[in-house]
């Protein structure tokens, strides 16, 4: 250490306090990085790695740097790579410093705490989430620092908590240090993968410490006043988030003004599997927004509205009155295209007020940000005028909450120029006429520059030296330059400042006096402009709560306009959402598939489900016929209805559903080491435990991951359980290839059979995509194989084997005789079914009362007799 320069010693001392972050060390107009930080940053950023000085052992010190005024894209790239960035600024004016300039870290930028647009997706929240537990009670809190949104909840059990984490989709997660150890480490592994993780020691979760953090952030507020008195574990998670803010932002987040507690009973619950299978916000195949329900429904024109719509999709309502309020607003806007288009046009000019407010409150806003705020506020009176003319209750509420902030708009308009520069310290930000002192300094500056031009002309005339020039540089200031050939003509009052190879440089008392006046004015102008800008920014920050409230109302309005436009353009109907059990859809359509294949006519279908005679629908039919599409569309229509949206149908009667479950596919869990069949059983078990009579269950091909007999048995038992157990008797759509399950409708009054209509023509099949009553008579697997492009030889051979199987011609070990080879000779006549030693089988058969056998019992009996042979 003693061999190092003072600045390098200072760097290492500060770096020791932030070992997990790349330290941006301010040196003049640059942020510099040294040692391992420099090596890592140069690789990620693709910038030149150089070196400075030498260590005591003669080795070079790696170095790289970036201009401080254009650091945002570099920081964004590092954060995107999962790195933390500690911003170390000069804490005093270098001109005033005695010795090395004091420096300190002013903030640490992490993936979950970015606020600059370069690091953010406009229509996605950027959440920092904390999770902790007290026994089986899991507390969860999450914060979007860029908008100030801060929410907390408690959940029963780790799986419910992890499902909520997946839904929230945080960019960074805070966990207690115990989550590093088994078994919790393994249980959360799939959720934390590819996310930035920070572990806190147990003392951070001390209740008293967390209460102090909450009180400090929210001006003395208590758990009771924040509505969190019944969420003690969630409050510990909130404390962890606030502790992280103290660590990284010096606790400075004035726009985070409240905590919003919520309970899972307030919303229709959707587990991770259901969200994925229904492709609510991203497609299964590529994880993209386009092709998802969100991609279809999002016609918002503001970033705030886009984020709000995603929340509405992820958290459908359980409150009928709130649903009806949204429906009323959508209907009014749908029926008033002129108003709707006017609102959309006005909203399109509103910037992201939530994130502008965040940067303003965190003192990170630029003059461009204030200009964007001014532009947005200028549109609010016209928006209010449009909304005020509407009659729907929710639109009236939004109108009351939209605050034009006239005084702030006027302040910014008078203070900030129309098109301010990006760099604050360059000046040119404050408008003429706003501040008298600034106007006077600008006049001096302009007059001084004019004086220089006049003085040059005067001196040329006085000396007769036509090549005389008055110039300026940062070292000498203003000077008069005369070539060597003309030195003899200079007056006596010229004072030599510098000798060059071909010229001499001079000053005069008059030039020096004006230099001090002009340059002093320019320095004072920049300092005064920055000070005035800070005052305006602070005035805007003081209105943070009003800005946030207006931003939220504008986001809601944007979503309502978007949904009304979608309903109008797509011919959606207003569903009748009710407290009963009947789910009736007339001519329902899958919203996304209908949109993606708009050139073709989507075949609509009716649906009837209830908790009585139509409680469980068995759907049979071939692959590709449309079973999965039909079931998913029922789930999506139910979800859209509880969002308050209109739905793709001619008519819809939708009951409030507490949960939607889906059991489709297994690709998600195979990477976790679970077999396809194990995934099926785990998800099925979760459904059977969690479903209620108010739930909607979608089951697609239960039991296909094991042997036929096992699969049929499990599928049959699952269907029976969902029908017979009244606590878990959810409204269920059950697609299957096991035609044996159609027999359930004979013995269970709440089970009905439906199939996908198919027509055969020239040994080919035509999918009619229509759901009709009754079970399917064939599975058409070979025809589907032909459509998929299997070689004709394989198709022909499959037909032969199928005929053989259907005739029951089996050889030893149950192998179809023809399946062992086409040239196998036909079997010799069999004289007796039983040999001399088959008395046991004969006796077993005598015990059977055929008339009383169910199809499932018959299948199990055949399997038993087969093992006895």
Swiss-Prot record:
ATP binds at residues 621-628. The keyword Nucleotide-binding applies. One of its GO terms (biological process) is mismatch repair. GO terms for molecular function: ATP binding; ATP-dependent DNA damage sensor activity; damaged DNA binding; mismatched DNA binding. The keyword DNA repair applies. GO terms for cellular component: cytosol. InterPro entries: DNA_mismatch_repair_MutS, DNA_mismatch_repair_MutS-lik_N, DNA_mismatch_repair_MutS/MSH, DNA_mismatch_repair_MutS_C, DNA_mismatch_repair_MutS_clamp, DNA_mismatch_repair_MutS_core, DNA_mismatch_repair_MutS_N, DNA_mismatch_repair_MutS_sf. Keywords: ATP-binding, DNA damage, DNA repair, DNA-binding, Nucleotide-binding. SUPFAM superfamilies: DNA repair protein MutS, domain I, DNA repair protein MutS, domain II, DNA repair protein MutS, domain III, P-loop containing nucleoside triphosphate hydrolases. Signal peptide: none annotated. This protein is involved in the repair of mismatches in DNA. It is possible that it carries out the mismatch recognition step. This protein has a weak ATPase activity. Belongs to the DNA mismatch repair MutS family. This is DNA mismatch repair protein MutS.
């Amino acid at each position: 250490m003693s061999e190092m320069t003072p600045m390098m010693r200072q760097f290492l001392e500060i770096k020791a306090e932030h070992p997990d972050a790349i330290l941006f060390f301010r040196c003049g107009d640059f942020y510099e990085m040294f040692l391992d930080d420099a090596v890592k940053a140069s690789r990620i950023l693709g910038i030149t790695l150089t070196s400075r000085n030498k260590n005591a052992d003669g080795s070079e010190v790696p170095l790289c740097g970036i201009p401080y005024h254009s650091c945002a894209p570099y920081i964004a790239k590092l954060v995107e790579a999962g790195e933390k960035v500690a911003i170390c600024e000069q804490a005093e004016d270098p001109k005033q410093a005695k010795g090395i300039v004091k420096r300190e870290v002013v903030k640490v930028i992490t993936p979950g705490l970015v606020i600059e647009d370069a690091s953010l997706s406009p229509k996605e929240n950027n959440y920092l989430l904390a999770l902790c537990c007290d026994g089986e009670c899991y507390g969860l809190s999450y914060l979007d620092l860029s908008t100030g949104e801060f929410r907390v909840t408690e959940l029963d059990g780790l799986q419910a908590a992890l499902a909520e984490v997946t839904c929230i989709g945080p960019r960074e997660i805070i966990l207690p240090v115990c989550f590093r150890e088994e078994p919790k480490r393994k249980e959360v592994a799939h959720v934390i993968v590819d996310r930035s993780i920070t572990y806190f020691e147990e003392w951070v979760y001390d209740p008293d410490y967390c209460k102090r953090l909450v009180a400090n952030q929210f001006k003395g507020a208590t758990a009771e006043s924040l509505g969190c008195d019944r969420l003690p574990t969630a409050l510990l998670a909130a404390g962890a988030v606030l502790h992280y803010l103290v660590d990284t932002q010096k606790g400075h987040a004035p726009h985070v003004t409240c905590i919003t507690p919520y309970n899972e009973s307030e919303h229709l619950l959707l587990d991770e599997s259901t969200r994925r299978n229904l492709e609510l916000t991203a497609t299964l195949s590529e994880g993209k927004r386009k092709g998802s329900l969100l991609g279809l429904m999002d016609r918002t024109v503001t970033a705030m509205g886009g984020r709000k719509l995603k929340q509405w999709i992820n958290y459908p309502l359980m409150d009928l009155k709130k649903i009806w309020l949204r429906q009323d607003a959508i209907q009014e806007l749908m029926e008033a295209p002129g108003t709707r288009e006017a609102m959309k046009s006005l909203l399109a000019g509103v910037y992201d007020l939530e994130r502008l407010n965040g940067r303003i409150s965190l003192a990170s806003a630029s003059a461009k940000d204030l200009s964007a705020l001014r532009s947005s506020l200028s549109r609010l009176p016209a928006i209010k005028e449009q909304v005020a003319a509407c009659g729907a209750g929710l639109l009236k509420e939004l109108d009351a909450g939209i605050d034009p902030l006239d005084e702030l708009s006027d302040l910014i308009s008078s203070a900030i120029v129309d098109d301010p520069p990006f760099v604050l310290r360059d000046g040119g930000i404050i408008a003429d006429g706003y501040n008298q002192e600034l106007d006077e300094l600008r006049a001096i500056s302009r007059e001084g520059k004019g004086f220089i031009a006049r003085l040059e002309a005067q001196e040329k005339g006085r000396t007769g030296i036509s090549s005389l020039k008055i110039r300026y540089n940062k070292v000498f200031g203003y000077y008069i330059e005369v070539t060597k050939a003309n030195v003899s003509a200079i007056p006596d009052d010229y004072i030599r400042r510098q000798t060059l190879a071909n010229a001499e440089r001079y000053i005069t008392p008059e030039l020096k006096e004006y230099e001090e006046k002009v340059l002093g004015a320019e320095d004072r102008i920049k300092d005064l402009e920055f000070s005035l800008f800070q005052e305006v920014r602070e005035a805007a920050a003081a209105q943070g709560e009003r800005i946030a409230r207006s931003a939220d109302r504008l986001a809601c309005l944007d979503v309502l306009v978007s949904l009304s436009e979608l309903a109008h353009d797509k011919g959606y109907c207003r569903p009748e959402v009710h407290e009963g059990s009947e789910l009736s859809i007339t001519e329902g359509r899958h919203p996304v598939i209908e949109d993606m294949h708009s050139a073709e006519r989507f075949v609509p279908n009716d649906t009837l489900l209830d908790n009585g005679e139509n409680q469980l629908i068995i759907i049979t039919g071939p692959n590709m016929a449309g079973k999965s599409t039909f079931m998913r569309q029922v789930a999506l229509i139910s979800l859209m209805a509880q969002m308050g949206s209109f739905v793709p149908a001619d008519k819809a009667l939708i009951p409030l559903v507490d949960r939607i479950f889906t059991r489709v596919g297994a690709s998600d869990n195979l990477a976790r080491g679970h077999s396809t069949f194990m995934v099926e059983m785990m998800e099925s078990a979760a459904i059977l435990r969690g479903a209620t009579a108010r739930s909607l269950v979608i089951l697609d091909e239960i039991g296909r991951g094991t042997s036929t007999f096992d699969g049929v048995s499990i599928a049959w038992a699952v269907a029976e359980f969902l029908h017979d157990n009244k606590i878990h008797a959810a409204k269920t759509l059950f697609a299957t290839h096991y035609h044996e399950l159609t027999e359930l409708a004979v013995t269970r009054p709440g089970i009905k059979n439906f199939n996908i209509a198919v027509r055969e023509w020239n040994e080919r099949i035509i999918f009619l995509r229509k759901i009709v009553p009754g079970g399917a008579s064939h599975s058409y697997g070979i025809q589907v194989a032909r459509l998929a492009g299997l070689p004709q030889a394989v198709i022909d051979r499959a037909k032969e084997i199928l005929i053989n199987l259907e005739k029951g011609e089996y050889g030893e070990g149950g192998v179809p005789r023809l399946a062992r080879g086409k040239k196998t000779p036909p079997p010799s006549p069999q004289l007796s079914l039983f040999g001399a030693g088959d008395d046991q089988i004969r006796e077993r058969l005598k015990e059977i009362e055929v008339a009383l056998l169910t199809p499932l019992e018959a299948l199990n009996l055949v399997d038993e007799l087969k093992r006895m042979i």
